[in-house]
Amino acid sequence: MGELSGCTGGSRAGGPGPRLPLLLLLLLWPARASDAAPPPHVVFVLADDLGWNDLGFHGSVIRTPHLDALAAGGVVLDNYYVQPLCTPSRSQLLTGRYQIHMGLQHYLIMTCQPNCVPLDEKLLPQLLKDAGYATHMVGKWHLGMYRKECLPTRRGFDTYFGYLLGSEDYYTHEACAPIECLNGTRCALDLRDGEEPAKEYTDIYSTNIFTKRATTLIANHPPEKPLFLYLAFQSVHDPLQVPEEYMEPYDFIQDKHRRIYAGMVSLLDEAVGNVTKALKSRGLWNNTVLIFSTDNGGQTRSGGNNWPLRGRKGTLWEGGIRGAGFVASPLLKQKGVKSRELMHITDWLPTLVNLAGGSTHGTKPLDGFDVWETISEGSPSPRVELLLNIDPDFFDGLPCPGKNTTPEKNDSFPLEHSAFNTSIHAGIRYKNWKLLTGYPGCGYWFPPPSQSNISEVPSVDSPTKTLWLFDINRDPEERHDVSREHPHIVQNLLSRLQYYHEHSVPSYFPPLDPRCDPKGTGVWSPWM
């Protein structure tokens, strides 16, 4: 038989010659969408007021076996930052943007304030919904509710079950807040299923209610559709309440607040274990990314602890903003490791949207970075800097023990620091450096009540001091201010603070509106 027309090299019909290019073509042909790996399910568990020293994998005496096991098989985030209070952390989680860019840099959203995360911000659930996800939220909102347009079901969540305000009773599900015209406080129900009051859960502990709703959502979820579940537990925010049996293992803790708190953490740990079990039972776990994070540091006045870190909830010290967290997933390329790469709560939005195959188109400029390769593969973090906050109107709602007020603000500042007014409450991280200005909040160290007779170790800083520089890698406990040894670092970071300050929007902190009064309905609800 003669050679095939157009062939070279002596290849004959039926021989290997023509098949090799065909094989290469098939190998190089783009995979069909149906052949690609399906987008992962995402479960984001946010604990409330959980301290650095309140988890077993950080060396706490509190027993957290389920969280410890997930952390041990995943990636522990050891250089991860959140905000000092709940609204700031939650808003930055869902927008991927610093609070100075939304007018939320001052304190938090109060119950009767006509305020919420700006409605022109596109939130994480909206972006994931655009990517084909089912989006569900269970638990604490605290991002404003004065208008129905501010509610979770109007901001991208298919379903919502939880409470809208900052804290409430774990059993009655009532929240109390001041009503200015009454010169007193009003208490009312704050629990909703969708947008309707949920009145049938009295005397049922909130962590159990939220866990039941989360596991039901998982059990009923079609595995072929990607799931986003945002589970924002009430635990372990005050009031200090927990079923008695969860306190019994902690009889050795003499401090009553710490003992109740420990029981609350144990119940939270059990809840996360039940959620994980539900994911496995439904066959979702092998394609799930589970993220666990606190929203801010522990509140030492309510049993929490951040030892050996300095400070507590409400402060820019490490005890207020160093986030306890981890990522657990069979999809991780590295497991059982601790990441020292710099990360921030704003990073979750771009990370999860990109992981979902979605797009951040339509958002305002993001401050977060996609850190999935950092978490999953151990790559260097794309983040080298993060803004902690800038709040010219800061007041200390949680003063140091024995102190009743915020130290008086000194508006004069040395000329050598003229790049930024150092009397302003602000903070910034750059690589290993951390700069604080103004009054960062109570700078005491608080040893664990169960391990020491000393309730706090006061700072020796002058009350008029308004500038600190720390090498956090060498000094995570913030005991050695090195600002005098590194004036050029100070100047550079002050210049960065000034840049952020100039590009911030004015803080929006409207006065309380007495029309919020729930007297007529007995339920906290939108009023405008």
UniProtKB/Swiss-Prot annotation:
SS bond list: C112-C516, C116-C150, C176-C187, C400-C442
UniProt: substrate binding residues: K140, H237, K313
Source organism superkingdom: Eukaryota
GO biological process: anterior head development; autophagy; colon epithelial cell migration; dermatan sulfate proteoglycan catabolic process; positive regulation of neuron projection development; regulation of epithelial cell migration; response to estrogen; response to methylmercury
Location(s) in or outside the cell: Lysosome; Cell surface
UniProt keywords, alphabetically: Calcium, Disulfide bond, Glycoprotein, Hydrolase, Lysosome, Metal-binding, Mucopolysaccharidosis
Main localisation: other
Pfam families: Sulfatase
Family annotation (InterPro entries): Alkaline_phosphatase_core_sf (IPR017850), ARSB (IPR047115), Sulfatase_CS (IPR024607), Sulfatase_N (IPR000917)
Cofactor binding: number and manner: Binds 1 Ca(2+) ion per subunit.
UniProt xrefs under Gene3D superfamilies: 3.30.1120.10, Alkaline Phosphatase, subunit A
GO CC terms of this entry: cell surface; lysosome
GO function terms (MF aspect): arylsulfatase activity; metal ion binding; N-acetylgalactosamine-4-sulfatase activity; N-acetylgalactosamine-6-sulfatase activity; sulfuric ester hydrolase activity
Amino-acid positions noted as binding Ca(2+) in the UniProt annotation, renumbered to this chain: D48, D49, C86, D295, N296
Residue positions, PTM 3-oxoalanine (Cys): C86
Regulation: Inhibited by ethanol.
EC annotation from Swiss-Prot or TrEMBL: 3.1.6.12
Residues annotated as the enzyme's active site: C86, H142
Family designation: Belongs to the sulfatase family.
Disease note: Defects in Arsb are the cause of mucopolysaccharidosis type VI (MPS-VI).
Its biological purpose: Removes sulfate groups from chondroitin-4-sulfate (C4S) and regulates its degradation. In the central nervous system, is a regulator of neurite outgrowth and neuronal plasticity, acting through the control of sulfate glycosaminoglycans and neurocan levels. Involved in the regulation of cell adhesion, cell migration and invasion in colonic epithelium.
Assembly and binders: Homodimer.
This protein's name: Arylsulfatase B
